[in-house]
Amino acid sequence: MLKDTLVIWGGEFGRTPFGQYNSGNSKKPNGRDHFGRAFSWVMAGGGIKPGSIYGETDEFGWNITKGRVHVHDMQATILHLCGIDHEKLTFRYQGRQFRLSDVHGHVVKGLLA
C-alpha cells in the first residue's frame, strides 16, 4: 500500500533550537518560537527514497549547511510525486506568473527513489 500512497508530516517552518523564556519565569522555558530557517518533514512511500535524510544544519540547528530546501521546492516535489507537473499549474494575474510552487520552486530530486 505504501508504494501507491504518499505520507507526509511536517510544516513550512520549524521551531527555534532553544527554549524561549518569559520575563516572569526565567528558570523554565515556556516553549519555542517559529523558526523559518530550518524545518523537518517526515515523508514515506509514493516514490520517496526510503531511509534517507536530506539536508543538514550546523551543530546548533541554526543555519542550513547542506541541502537547503524552500517550501516551494517541497510543494513542487509533492506535486511531482502525485503525477502533476507543477509548472503547468501556472496562471497569470496582474502581469505576474503564479503557481503553488511559485516561479522558483524545483523538484528535490535527492528525495526521489
Where are these regions (language model features)?
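Ligand-binding pockets and gating/stacking loops
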Residues: 1-113
